[in-house]
A protein has these predicted regions:
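Hydrophobic, Leu/Ile/Phe/Ala-enriched alpha-helical segments that form helix-helix packing faces
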Residues: 16, 20, 25, 64-71, ...
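A generic structural signal for short, solvent-exposed coil/turn residues
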Residues: 21-23, 40, 83, 94
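Catalytic metal-binding acidic patch
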Residues: 33-63
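Short secondary-structure capping/turn segments at boundaries of alpha-helices and beta-strands
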Residues: 15-18, 32-38, 74-78, 86-90
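Helical scaffold of the NTase/Pol beta-like nucleotidyltransferase catalytic core
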Residues: 1-29
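Residue-level signal for beta-strand positions within conserved beta-sheet cores that form or flank
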Residues: 25, 44, 98
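Conserved NTP/Mg2+-binding pocket subregion across the NTase superfamily
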Residues: 1-5, 68-142
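Ordered hydrophobic segments in well-structured contexts
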Residues: 28, 49-51, 89-91
């Protein structure tokens, strides 16, 4: 799945996956956007959903800027309140520019989604499948 990405994107995604797999507080890593819809090129951003164990959600949300800084040379990051999504961290990495969106949620929060994500890793595939099956993705009415 990751092998179809441009080198910069693939390298970042692989590094993120390894980092999150080694963190027992993380339940799953999901991908969305052009990663699943197609049309991905060297100018595309990466859209990730980081599913967190609810026991650690507040802790990780409080540390998400610092966490993003461990993923590479973070040029700038800001939260997504301006797009109505405060759980979103919008990141720009460099020196070769890479836009990465990290959305931090718990498994229960997967009920509200705009697309069916790709699963990059999960600690409990059955629980993830059950949660995804409860609700279908839909765009909000604007």
């Amino acid at each position: 799945m990751l092998n179809t990405l441009p080198d910069l994107h693939r390298s970042f995604a692989e590094q993120l996956k390894l980092k999150l797999q080694s963190d027992s507080r993380i339940h799953s890593l999901l991908a969305g956007g052009s990663f699943i819809h197609g049309g991905f090129d060297q100018y595309s951003d990466l859209d990730f959903v980081v599913v967190i164990d609810p026991l650690y959600y507040d802790e990780i949300m409080a540390q998400r800027m610092a966490f993003a800084g461990t993923l590479g040379h973070l040029l700038h990051a800001f939260t997504g309140e301006h797009v109505g999504e405060p759980r979103l961290l919008i990141c720009l990495f460099g020196p070769e520019l890479l836009h990465v969106d990290l959305k931090f949620i718990t498994l229960d929060m997967l009920t509200q989604r705009v697309e069916e994500p790709a699963v990059l890793f999960t600690r409990d595939n059955d629980a993830l499948k059950r949660q995804l099956a409860k609700f279908c993705a839909h765009w909000p009415n604007m």
